[in-house]
Design a protein with these regions (language model features):
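Catalytic machinery of carbohydrate-active enzymes
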Residues: 1-319
Length: 319
């Protein structure tokens, strides 16, 4: 079936699937999103595990290149250089249609993952969906949930068992739990014997001054690799729906995601380590949902879900 996005030529999914299926040299272009990058690295790893040569272009992957040993990872490919750079590959692939840009003018064959699957829905986890697509549709025999990430050898996994890495920011306000609730959650975690640390980029610290004003500790993130290190050596992770949550799961840390969109978050939730989501008991539709869930989901509910996560994880590792 042929589909087309605005400004792009018709896309015949069956033809483009065959192009990727038979490609020996693949260029994987990553969207400028951390979570999407980590998920699509699963396709990269499954292609590589079945004898394909894959080059990754993406700034988030490049920032974590030491965590992906043996994989050819380069910075994002500027569109002005795409025609020349992609000429050496049998197929160029990316998750989204036309993002970071359309590939039709630059690659001999190309592939948009989103054109072949249900993007958001019930009954699946995105990471599992990518693995299953690689096996069932691309015909790759050796497929797993592994995306090639390996913690740096000098690190100690969950060295600080009572430390909780908390990520209060997100890509949009509608995904961001209320700041006052993050403050109260931190205080409740402290009273429960945990050590919450809030991960913030330098430019976010002013916006989140309420955390330091209430005596809560800040981890000032600068390099993404350092953030991965900090989370990998923490015991737990709590945050909004964001790429940092996927990173936490990917480095082996149990994750709790706070959300007002449970259907979307269930399918897009972190999938490498133990994870749970928590959301209000009642959520209206449309814009009301995006405005109100942030306040309706209370800290006591999130702390209860956090305790359920700790119980679940500790039971799993004891079995």
């Amino acid at each position: 079936m042929a589909t087309s996005a605005s400004g792009l030529p018709p896309y015949v999914a069956a033809e483009h699937q065959q192009q990727l299926k038979h490609a020996n040299r693949v260029a994987m272009l990553m969207a400028p999103r951390l979570g999407d990058t980590l998920l699509m690295m699963n396709m990269v790893q499954n292609l590589r595990a079945n004898g394909r040569s894959v080059t990754v272009f993406g700034d988030y992957a490049y920032a974590l290149r030491a965590w992906f040993p043996g994989i050819d990872i380069r910075p994002s490919l500027p569109e002005s250089e795409a025609s020349h750079a992609l000429a050496d590959y049998d197929c160029a692939a990316q998750m989204h249609v036309g993002w970071p840009y359309g590939l039709h003018d630059y690659a001999r064959s190309y592939f948009y993952y989103d054109e072949h699957v249900v993007v958001t829905g019930k009954g699946f986890i995105k990471l599992n969906q990518i693995r299953d697509y690689c096996h069932q549709q691309l015909g790759l025999e050796n497929c797993s949930l592994n995306n090639g990430l390996r913690p740096l050898p000098e690190l100690r996994h969950r060295q600080h068992l009572r430390r909780v890495a908390v990520h209060p920011s997100s890509g949009g306000e509608e995904r961001r739990w209320a700041a006052s609730h993050f403050v109260e959650l931190g205080k409740r975690l402290q009273r429960s014997g945990y050590q919450p640390f809030y991960i913030l980029a330098p430019y976010e610290r002013e916006q989140w001054a309420c955390l330091a004003e209430n005596g809560l500790s800040i981890y000032p993130s600068t390099l993404l690799s350092d953030v991965a290190t900090f989370i990998h050596e923490s015991g737990w992770f709590v945050g909004n729906e964001s790429g940092i949550g996927h990173l936490a799961s990917n480095v082996g840390i149990p994750t709790l995601t706070v959300t007002g969109r449970p259907t979307r978050t269930l399918s897009w939730r972190p999938g490498w380590s133990t994870s749970r989501i928590v959301y209000p008991g009642y959520i209206p539709g449309g814009r009301l949902r995006d405005r109100l869930w942030r306040h309706w989901l209370k800290p006591r509910q999130v702390l209860r879900a956090f305790r359920q996560l700790t119980d679940q994880y500790e039971k799993q590792i004891s079995e």
